[in-house]
């Protein structure tokens, strides 16, 4: 499928060590999912990458239903990863990345902070909730949610 933006490609969203290990074909197979991945990338991830100034690594992007349901993943049946509306971005300092996304006013649906990555989702064509959530495993600093700092 090729390039989405100057720093992201569809293959990055399809790449999955878990899928490879268990012989699961994890390929974006519908235009609807492809368009959702494109929208997430162009509206949230590429602007974040531009502001961050360093590469962003996708740990988990698109997940076919079989991969999402695999015990090694344990994804929710309603996961936005299945729809192409979510990506988990590796971060040595997840709160710094999340704070930047918040301060930029990026139109995310959910931003969930984990110890080693940040989950970003964006509902294709839908209203975005702008939720900042923390996985129970995350014990670090919290995002400063100040409306004066948020541009969006």
Residue ranges and their predicted role:
Residues 78, 82-83, 87, 91-152:
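Catalytic cores and adjacent binding grooves of peptidoglycan-active enzymes
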Residues 34, 38, 68, 98-99:
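Generic detector of well-ordered alpha-helical segments enriched in charged/polar residues
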Residues 1-51, 138-152:
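Extracytoplasmic cell-surface/polysaccharide-interacting catalytic and binding patches
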């Amino acid at each position: 499928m090729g390039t989405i933006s100057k720093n992201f490609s569809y293959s990055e969203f399809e790449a999955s060590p878990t899928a490879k290990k268990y012989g699961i074909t994890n390929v974006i197979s519908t235009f609807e999912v492809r368009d959702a991945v494109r929208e997430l990338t162009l509206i949230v991830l590429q602007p974040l990458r531009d502001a961050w100034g360093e590469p962003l690594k996708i740990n988990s992007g698109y997940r076919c239903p079989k991969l999402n349901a695999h015990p090694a993943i344990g994804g929710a049946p309603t996961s936005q990863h299945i729809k192409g509306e979510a990506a988990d971005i590796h971060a040595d300092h997840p709160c710094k990345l999340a704070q930047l996304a918040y301060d930029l006013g990026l139109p995310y649906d959910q931003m969930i902070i984990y110890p080693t990555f940040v989950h970003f989702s964006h509902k294709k064509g839908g209203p975005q909730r702008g939720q900042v959530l923390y996985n129970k495993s995350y014990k670090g600093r919290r995002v400063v949610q100040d409306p004066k700092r948020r541009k969006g």
